[in-house]
Amino acid sequence: MEFSPRAAELTNLLESRITNFYTNFQVDEIGRVVSVGDGIARVYGLNEIQAGEMVEFASGVKGIALNLENENVGIVVFGSDTAIKEGDLVKRTGSIVDVPAGKAMLGRVVDALGVPIDGRGALSDHERRRVEVKAPGIIERKSVHEPMQTGLKAVDSLVPIGRGQRELIIGDRQTGKTAIAIDTILNQKQLNSKATSESETLYCVYVAVGQKRSTVAQLVQILSEANALEYSILVAATASDPAPLQFLAPYSGCAMGEYFRDNGMHALIIYDDLSKQAVAYRQMSLLLRRPPGREAFPGDVFYLHSRLLERAAKRSDQTGAGSLTALPVIETQAGDVSAYIPTNVISITDGQICLETELFYRGIRPAINVGLSVSRVGSAAQLKAMKQVCGSPKLELAQYREVAAFAQFGSDLDAATQALLNRGARLTEVPKQPQYAPLPIEKQILVIYAAVNGFCDRMPLDKISQYERTIPNSVKPELLQSLKGGLTNEKKMELDSFLKECALNY
């Protein structure tokens, strides 16, 4: 049978139509809720989903896929699960959890997903960063060598912190853990105002996990009154927020801090506190039917904190020389630092500042136990002058504590022991400091130099704080400023004559 011209025409027409055929359909992989309760949804049908991927429920609530099983997917819900019903549709978003980052975040208060909660409108120009990323490798890092000043005499002299370090703040409730963190943020105000370049400025990220909303509001007020909010970001997952948001908040804050670290700038991040994050993670894991381990925590609770804290680093010069310093906070029960979570975090960090209730009630504030507190890498970052004056106090304080216990029993002590007790009592008095009153480093050096070199030895203990306040204001400003560069013999002679003269008034 011959092909007629009409048939050939029709064939060409059909071919052209088929080749130009285009479907503009968007194919979404969807699943259905099998069961829901306690903030956990079991979903059937999401066969291609990735671990840690965001999903969206029909009600608009979002969730994250944590358990990928044969039959279904275990999804933790970010928000209330009351609007989710059995049989509801669940849609994949195709994206791993990410948060906004950048300088537009400074001065803002956001939740664990980076959504502003301060009532000041949407965020302006920003980029998005994944919440979970790998920590920088060995080649990309450099050893810690720049100081991160807290403005607290007890910390900057005895347990110094460097940029890129992880220093744990550990203690019972109501011992002043948050106060140390806030003082550190406030101290950056005077340092940032003198900074001449981006590489000198230190930006701060404060992550509040499981705290009262009133506490977070109070913190915002303190920072804004001190004009410290302009270089700070607050990430809040309060006690009333669901456990998944309390688990996610530290990672979100870390991603925001990493923006500065990876762009050649410096950032400080405070996790307040990681005990509550571990409790939130335990709750999620048990509801997801993961096997419990010690203290009912899941087996990977160490990895929960290690992968977070390893992201704090000092980058090498080739990768921008930025840094992210971490100050995680852990709350202990009745001073037990050998519990599961405290020992985990102590082993991950580069040192710890131990706070004690007994010292706090004795009026030694910040209530730092100098014997238990260490900084494993910070001394390399300490200023030369501070290193020169702080060699002996730690040893003298240790000897004082040893002798003070025996001195309670006997009254007839030899002159050397009496002198040691006398000096120790004054060295215990010097690190005391009121809250929200950080001290510039040059004033700290002056005060510690006076105490270490015996200028306070004959002074009544109740006069020492007054003496401390007076000497930085009486000394020549140029001599005070020159202390940062180190102590030469000429400077020491000049300081000695000035301090001797001042001590006569007390």
Swiss-Prot record:
SUPFAM superfamilies: C-terminal domain of alpha and beta subunits of F1 ATP synthase, N-terminal domain of alpha and beta subunits of F1 ATP synthase, P-loop containing nucleoside triphosphate hydrolases
Site positions per UniProt: Required for activity: 373
Record bears the keyword Membrane: yes
One Gene Ontology cellular component: mitochondrion
InterPro entries per record: ATP_synth_asu-like_sf, ATP_synth_asu_C, ATP_synth_asu_C_sf, ATP_synth_F1_a_nt-bd_dom, ATP_synth_F1_asu, ATPase_a/bsu_AS, ATPase_F1/V1/A1_a/bsu_N, ATPase_F1/V1/A1_a/bsu_N_sf
BP terms from Gene Ontology: ATP biosynthetic process
PROSITE patterns hit by this protein: ATPASE_ALPHA_BETA
GO molecular function: ADP binding; ATP binding; proton-transporting ATP synthase activity, rotational mechanism
Amino acids binding ATP: 171-178
Subcellular location: Mitochondrion; Mitochondrion inner membrane
Chief place where the protein resides: mitochondrion
Gene3D superfamilies found in the cross-reference section: 2.40.30.20, ATP synthase alpha/beta chain, C-terminal domain, P-loop containing nucleotide triphosphate hydrolases
Entry keyword ATP-binding: yes
Keyword annotations of the record: ATP synthesis, ATP-binding, CF(1), Hydrogen ion transport, Ion transport, Membrane, Mitochondrion, Mitochondrion inner membrane, Nucleotide-binding, Transport
Protein function: Mitochondrial membrane ATP synthase (F(1)F(0) ATP synthase or Complex V) produces ATP from ADP in the presence of a proton gradient across the membrane which is generated by electron transport complexes of the respiratory chain. F-type ATPases consist of two structural domains, F(1) - containing the extramembraneous catalytic core, and F(0) - containing the membrane proton channel, linked together by a central stalk and a peripheral stalk. During catalysis, ATP synthesis in the catalytic domain of F(1) is coupled via a rotary mechanism of the central stalk subunits to proton translocation.
Self-association and partners: F-type ATPases have 2 components, CF(1) - the catalytic core - and CF(0) - the membrane proton channel. CF(1) has five subunits: alpha(3), beta(3), gamma(1), delta(1), epsilon(1). CF(0) has three main subunits: a, b and c.
Family the entry assigns: Belongs to the ATPase alpha/beta chains family.
Protein name as it appears in the record: ATP synthase subunit alpha, mitochondrial
Organism: Beta vulgaris (Sugar beet)
Organism lineage string: Eukaryota, Viridiplantae, Streptophyta, Embryophyta, Tracheophyta
Gene name in the database record: ATPA
